[in-house]
Amino acid sequence: MDPLGSFMTQITRFVPIFAILFGLGTFGLNAAISQEGAAKGAGSIEDKSPFETLPGMQPSGNMLLPNGWTINAQGRQAPLGDFPVHLLVHPDGNNLIVLHCGYGEHEIITLDAKTLNKIARVPVPQSFYGLALSNDGAWIVASGGEDERVYAFPYNKGYLGEPVVHTLATKTDKFVVSGVGLSKDDTEFYACGLLGNQVKRGKRPFGAMEKPGVSPTETLQLPDDSYPYTVLEDAANQRLFVSLWGRSAIGVVDLKTFQLVATWKTQSHPTEMIYLDDTNRLLVACSDENSVVALDATTGELQEVLLTALYPAAKNGSTPSAICVSADRRVLVAVNSCNNNIALFDISEPKKSRSLGYIPVGWYPTNVKFTVSGDQIIVTNGKGLSSKDNRYGPNPLKPAPKNVTEYIGGLLQGSLSAIPTPTPEELATMTRLAFQGAPLRKDSVVVDAERSPNNPVPAKVGDPSPIKHCIYIIKENRTYDQLFGDVAKGNGDPGLCIFGENVTPNHHALVNQFVLLDNFYVDGEVSADGHEWTMAAYATDFVEKTWPLTYGKSRGKLTYPAEGATKIGQPSSGYLWGKCKEAGKSYFSFGEFIANGRNPGDPSRAKIEVLEGHFDPNYRSYDLDYSDLDRAASFIKRLKQFEEAGELPNFITMHLPNDHTAGTRVGKLTPTAMVAQNDAALGLVIEAITKSKFWPEVAVFVIQDD
């Protein structure tokens, strides 16, 4: 066999959602779990409509995720910890080293490369992506994240000793160590400051500090919003490459002066880099653009763009966030984090690279490396191999100590895939599996299976429809069973229903009169990625990599990354409002992606540019001390103004958040009271819409963010 030779448990439903098409009659608007992924073939759901298929283990042995993707990870699988983000292969070929930076324990895990058995687990107080090995393999250097540290661990056959600690900033500084690196002779170390927009260079990386305090370093200041991700040294030319995650560029640093001498344009969100000195190319993963770019390493000129998505015309969202090359530098591998596969390319001839195929791996792959011998491809999967329910979570009837597995942030533990480097024939088979496991369509047309003749939803863009206005209501955090487990016609669990019809009569009246979607799921785990998926059908790698820290081990430096809070968190493909603008449709937001004024009554402001002039400044966004009934009143007041003007925006978003509840906090409304309040507010909103002049041409969709 000549690898690549010829060409070189049950799922918890996260969301109660119903759709109402007002004035258009009642019909079954089914929620499709899968589209193309339901086609016949290996890794698919045979002979069943996707509308009838539940996520979880399928007869084929594959795992259907709630988002419609099928996990059919190739090779051997091994469990890891919480959100593995960076992988190294020890130069002796015997061990694998994995850094974890999730909601739970931050740690370095070492594994035997042959058996995949764990050798050691070493906790790190906090980290963020950065991991490097000394040239002799005797030291591991790791990021300390918001603790502003770089750790240097002595390493011996899979075991780590007590680290040498370099403190790079004070506790109040906002440097935040991300990527780290070592000089070729191991006498210096480099550290990126994600929030400080800086790179620091220090000496004696493995030597203990002579006195306590901040270590002496040289500091390079980068432009604002650079968000330096990692570094790569070109020792022969005395240069340091820095991937500027937030500026779509590579910074080139002169190591003699430690000054920025050039900035080379890339595509959006450059992350990992590989320098090929034999062909003078710099390869850069661009995670927000479905691409890996090849730059001339002398001039920075763009030589070619390698598209990693399954389909050439696919919209952004594949998330190629990490890359590696084979020892002979002929094959490039890129992880497609959001496609649950890796893409392989023949890069043997500059400017003439070509796709070789795809290999299915686990859920949200984050890093990839070839083994030293080249006989295996190793992949870390950030979210493991399946979705899970929190069966060990809180139960009001059975008090128990808090457990990290009770919360979604720590529920999806990572995994490792070890794939024998395939032959061309094996890769062709794996490529077919990758396509069969994807809920994508080559032409992106609407699935028209089981459509009734009077379906008002257009089969394709441009077809006529009586729907002229869509109102999209986003609520917070409730599961299907919590609200609708008591609905007999739905596939729910009454034992999990805590806000049933006695608490939510309006929700129940709506799903009984109109449409109940009991097999519909959201892609977000928490509000941070949830609102991004809700409004963009995508959460960037910046959001995915930072929210676990902000929700878990944050020291208060990294902040909420989503809903327009950061420019880098916004996908380059934009949000639904931007798509409306491109299509010449009017749009308006009540509270979604809106920043509140300091006090109720103070005007709010738009968080993103596209919403400027397209929102109600008197509608208060997320604030659990503010009543949803007041939000409903604010909407109704504006609706009357729309009626007086005779025009209703084509697309309206509304944040109705108080079903989030304040838990059992002292002095707050009880969860039951808050959900009941939210139910009453929704009823008032729907009543106002149905009594308005726009009613015959309106469709309303209600969804949970996560």
Enumerate the predicted regions with their spans.
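Bacterial N-terminal signal peptides that target proteins for export
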Residues: 2-18
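A short, polar/charged loop/turn motif at coil->beta-strand junctions and beta-hairpin connectors
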Residues: 3, 16, 70-74, 214, ...
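Intrinsic-disorder-associated interaction segments
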Residues: 4-7, 423, 628
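Bacterial N-terminal signal peptides
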Residues: 15-28
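Generic recognition of well-ordered alpha-helical segments
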Residues: 17, 378-380, 415-418, 506, ...
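Predominantly soluble domains enriched in secretory-pathway, periplasmic, or organellar proteins
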Residues: 33-454
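N-terminal pro-sequences and low-complexity stem/linker regions of secreted or lumenal proteins
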Residues: 429-706
